[in-house]
Amino acid sequence: IIRLRKVLGKKNELSFAAGGFQKFLDQSVDWKKIMPLLDRVNIMSYDLVNGYSKVTGHHTPLYSTNEKEESTDKAITYLLKLGIPATKLVIGAAFYTRSWKEVSNTNNGLYQSGVHIGGPSFKDYSTAFSVSNGWKYFWDDKAKASYWYNDKEKKFATGDDIPSVKAKTLYVINKKLGGIMFWELQLDDKKNGLLDAIYQIKTAQ
């Protein structure tokens, strides 16, 4: 990083994407040494529950719902306490879901055992999670996170949607962070998409 900064100079941006889970934050980066050399860090605050997980959960929540659960706010709070300027911190949004099958209808499938099977992108939500196909939508107000459950198929899905992305954008503004990024643009809907939701909140402030 020192060599890159010397070559790039101060006018060119030098940044990187970092995992948003606590083990990575604790063990993988010497934050106090590298952040003075960097313009920003993009926190991948998604896949916090991923394809390796045998238990469902919010994969990109804004807030933790218990002491053990990872979240966007948990990562940001940790980095701010290290003294990293808020303007150098960028949070992440997921334009896709994580899904599991063989999930029991307890707590609407949330925090239950299951088998990960991937999940649809935001542009396909309206068809993939339709009521006619047996899906029900749920909002976790503590986590500020959306999820879906299909009792007939015993499937659970978690991901960002318009309400959760708006909540994240407001969080960025209120915390005076460096911004919000996402994976990835091609997964968004062409009309009334998640990027539109980010823009609406940003321009309304």
List where the protein language model places each region:
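Glycan-binding loop/region signatures in secreted carbohydrate-active enzymes
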Residues: 49-51, 95-171, 197-205
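Substrate-binding surface in catalytic domains of secreted glycosidases
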Residues: 1-128
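Second-shell loop/turn segments in exported
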Residues: 60-67, 154-158, 184
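Active-site and adjacent substrate-binding regions of carbohydrate-active enzymes
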Residues: 1-20, 42, 156-205
